[in-house]
A protein has these predicted regions:
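N-terminal, charge-rich interaction modules
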Residues: 1-32
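Class I S-adenosyl-L-methionine
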Residues: 106-135
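Mid-chain, well-packed structural core segment of small domains
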Residues: 61-93
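Conserved acidic residues
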Residues: 15, 48-49
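Short, glycine-rich nucleotide/cofactor-binding loops
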Residues: 51-61
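Short acidic low-complexity segments
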Residues: 37-48
Length: 135
């Protein structure tokens, strides 16, 4: 039995959700979920528990990250989705590179999943959080 998209993303009972840039091809899977589509003043105030952001190139990703990263909680579940190489979407993002703004901001990639036949996602966590969890 395959895992649902929520199980893959380890989405549990987080309250302040951000899903930004959600493609229409998988939008239906999120239809029963209540989430913000961009960083709102309310999310800035409460901070983000769970974020899934979609980007097709590094410039777009870096713009999104400037808004999202300062508003994440210490232990937020934070995913960045990007097109697979086989998706036929022109992209400069891949799982091996393109993450300089995240790694420079103290984040590291800890997991990769496939959302569908077009999109993969990397989960990032703050480096010190990982040290606490595994230390």
């Amino acid at each position: 039995m395959s895992l649902s998209i929520f199980e893959k993303l380890q989405l549990a009972d987080e309250k302040n959700l951000l899903i930004q840039g959600l493609p229409s091809s998988i939008e239906k899977q999120f239809s029963k979920l209540s989430f913000a589509k961009n960083v709102t003043p309310l999310l800035k105030n409460r901070k983000i528990d769970f974020a899934l952001v979609f980007a097709v190139n590094e410039v777009q990703l870096n713009g999104i990250l400037r808004d999202v990263m300062p508003n994440l909680k210490e232990n937020s579940k934070f995913w960045v989705a990007y097109p697979k190489a086989t998706s036929k979407i022109v992209t400069d993002l891949n799982r091996e590179s393109s993450w300089n703004q995240l790694t420079g901001g103290g984040y590291e990639s800890i997991e990769r999943i496939e959302l569908d036949h077009v999109w993969s996602a990397l989960r990032f966590t703050r480096c010190e959080m990982e040290a606490v969890v595994n230390g």
